[in-house]
Amino acid sequence: MTEATLLRPHAEQLFAAELAALRTADALPAPPNWLMSPHAVVRYLLGGETVEGVEITPKYIGPRRIIEVAVATLATDRALLLLGVPGTAKTWVSEHLAAAVTGDSTLLVQGTAGTVEEAVRYGWNYARLIAEGPSQQALVPSPIMTAMRDGKIARLEELTRIPSEVQDALITVLSEKTLPIPELGGEVQATQGFNVIATANDRDRGVNDLSSALRRRFNTVVLPLPASLDDEVEIVTRRVADISGSLQLPEVPTSAEEIRRVVTVFRELRSGLTADGRNKLKQPSGTLSTAEAISVVTQGIAMSAHFGDGVLRPADTAAGIVGAVVKDPVNDAVVWLEYLEAVVRERDGWADFYRASRDVLHS
């Protein structure tokens, strides 16, 4: 399968030219088993410059210091915990950090309520285990064990979704940098370059608090929501362009005005305050994250291209916005109707969006 046919290439595949250019131009010392210096990793994440004739695109739009602290943590023996509400680019930053540092973002454990200890330690090929007994050949390493052996970065997504007793299996790995294998009478010791990047949020339902012992093994970096409307509009615009290209959606003249309108609605309902700060608003139950705004605009482009006139209009995004806001058909519907009547209806230039949103509710 060629890269062009992949629905979502890994960061090290999609941005291979940028990574190669930064490695070529990098004259600063790199930590053991790193492919580039910490300074070059930060340049890759923040972008906005041209290196060796290659434009380095921004992967993260936000305070530079946050990325510097994250990269500096990875250069030590401390694991990194990226903490934030849903939609603050935790997974995105984690993937790009791993791609820049080791060239491999695929050593991934996806945390769920059903994650078992074998996912973070090791498992067994039970056919060989029964036939031969415990052996290295019967051992099935987890991504974390593989990262320890190879001196790479393991990614642990949604750490707080994992049951607490499974979380605590990480303590020995993070503190002693070893993974005991009592069945074989041995252990795996981490080689230089090994580290763990975990992501977590404590806002969603169904999360498990981290124990104090485990939390002490991490340096925590909090990723905030975009600081300004302009920053969030830029993030949405860039990601929509990337996703539309990978999905090969028909070209649609993407209206900057429509993207700004979607982001404005999300920011106002998320904060419970209108953009001018004059009116307080009821807040819906959903998170209304930047990631959801990206999804709404991408869906709008598909609607416009396939069922509209090829221009992104309020009618194309209204259904997606209503779907993102109204998670609870009773309480959230009241919040949305009040917002439409009190804010959208009275706002200059928003009459078409008001009509489209009302049509969705009554369709």
Give the location of each predicted region.
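AAA+ P-loop NTPase catalytic core and its hallmark functional loops
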Residues: 2-248
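A diffuse structural propensity rather than consistent per-protein peaks
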Residues: 37, 116, 140, 155, ...
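Non-catalytic, well-ordered alpha-helical scaffold segments
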Residues: 64, 68, 142, 168, ...
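Amphipathic alpha-helical interaction segments
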Residues: 77, 104, 131, 221, ...
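Short acidic/histidine-centered micro-motifs embedded in hydrophobic/aromatic stretches
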Residues: 173, 265, 320
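Conserved AAA+ ATPase small/helical "lid" subdomain
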Residues: 233, 240-314
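C-terminal engagement/docking regions of AAA+ P-loop ATPases
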Residues: 305-363
